[in-house]
Amino acid sequence: RYFEWQEKRCYRSAKKIVVVTDSFKRTLTSRGIDPAKIVVVKNGVNKALFTPRPKDEALKAQLGLAGKTVIGYIGTHGMAHKLDFILQSAKKLEDNPNLHFLLIGGGAMKESLLKLKDELGCTNVTMLDSVMKEKVARYISILDVCLINLKKSPLFTTVIPSKIFENAGMGIPILMGVEGEAKDIISQYGAGLCFEPENFDDFKQKLTALLEPATYAKCKEGCRHLADNFDRKLLAANMLKVIESAK
C-alpha cells in the first residue's frame, strides 16, 4: 500500500508521463491520473538495421532449409510465449513437407521445449540458441513468416511485442497469436494475420490463408506501411517534443 501511494504520488507530481501502449494510458487514467499529462510513445523499428533485404540463401542452405517455407520465431523461450503450443501445432502439420518451423532463442522453458520436441518426434522443427543482436536481421531474412505467440490471458492484451516492428521493418508477414492492442496494430496495417491464442484450427487456417500469394503480397505491403509509421526516428522526435514541453 505504501509503494502504491508513492507510485501515485510520482504520477501526480510529474509534468508528463510517457507510456508505451494505449492500454497503459487507460489503466493510469482509470486510477485517477489526469489523461492530459499522459503521452503514448510506442516502441518502433530501427530501419537502419531492420530493412528489406534478399534472403540469405547460404544461411538457409547451411541450416538445411533450402526449398522450405520457413515459419520463424526469434526471441525468448519463456513461460509467457507458449511455444509448446507451437511445437504441438508443428507436429500436426508434418503432412505438409514444405513447411518448416525455426525457433531461435533461449529462456526458462528452452530445455523443456527441446525435450518436448524430441518426445513429439518433430521432423519439421529446428531449434537454435540465441544469436547476437547484430546477426538477428540475417536470420529474419530467411523467414517467410514471422511467428509471434503468447499465452491466452487477459494480461497479454495490453502488450505490444517488439518483434512486430523488427519483422515488419524487414517486410516479413506476421502470423500472430496475441489479442488486444498488438492484434489491432497488425489488423490496422494489414501486416499479417492473427489467430486465437492456443487454438490450433485457427492457427492452421490463418497460416494457410497467409501463404496464399495475393494475401502474402498484401501483407508484405502492410509491413512496409507499419514500419514507416513506427520508425524510431519519428518516435524519438515525438519523445523529444514531450521532454521539451515538460521543461
Label the predicted regions:
Residues R1, T51-G64, K220:
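A short helix/loop element that forms part of the nucleotide-sugar donor recognition site in Leloir-type
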Residues R1-I17:
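Membrane-proximal helix-turn-helix segments that form the acceptor-binding/catalytic region
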Residues S23, G44:
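Carbohydrate-associated surface elements
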Residues L65-A90, L102, K220:
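Conserved donor-binding/catalytic core segment of Leloir-type glycosyltransferases
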Residues H81, M132-Y139, D144-A168, L175-D184:
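Nucleotide-sugar-dependent
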Residues D202, T215-N229:
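A short, well-ordered alpha-helix in the C-terminal region of glycosyltransferases
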